[in-house]
Amino acid sequence: MRNNEKQELLVKEFKAILKAERFGSQGEIVDALRQSGFDNINQSKVSRMLTKFGAVRTRNAKMEMVYCLPVELGVPTVSSSLRELVMDIDYNNALVVIHTGPGAAQLIARLLDSLGKAEGILGVVAGDDTIFITPTRNIEVAELFDSVCDLFEYSV
């Protein structure tokens, strides 16, 4: 099995463990992963994974402090496609606005900026999770909206 496949299996199992909301310490998570066949896992790797996926400690139904994934899984991963990061696209008579998962706006804005004037994009401004797109003079905002929706396979 290739390293990439092993990593994907590890991530899948890690997320499943956190969804169970039974593990209160990193050591317990290490033990659970080892029981699932990931012998090379250690506490520092688990700590990095908890940070990477935005895991938090919270109280479960039994009022125990446990690790879990936040409800909003907007943290982009290496395998995330850009269309998965787009939450909403809308427009008014001046701009097209894209709402993304937290932290994804800069990445998507860079792609849009690279398309440039040939695609009717005069400029792009991005924050953490919101992008404003201004059309060029020769294109209507509704046309730009349609082309952006097509680009991200977004249906209204």
From Swiss-Prot:
Its main location: cytoplasm. The keyword Repressor applies. One of its GO terms (biological process) is regulation of arginine biosynthetic process. Pfam families: Arg_repressor (PF01316), Arg_repressor_C (PF02863). The keyword DNA-binding applies. One of its GO terms (molecular function) is arginine binding. Keywords: Amino-acid biosynthesis, Arginine biosynthesis, Cytoplasm, DNA-binding, Repressor, Transcription, Transcription regulation. It is found in: Cytoplasm. Transmembrane segments: none annotated. Belongs to the ArgR family. NCBIfam families: argR_whole (TIGR01529), PRK05066.1 (NF003457). This is Arginine repressor. It comes from Aliivibrio fischeri (strain ATCC 700601 / ES114) (Vibrio fischeri). The gene is argR.
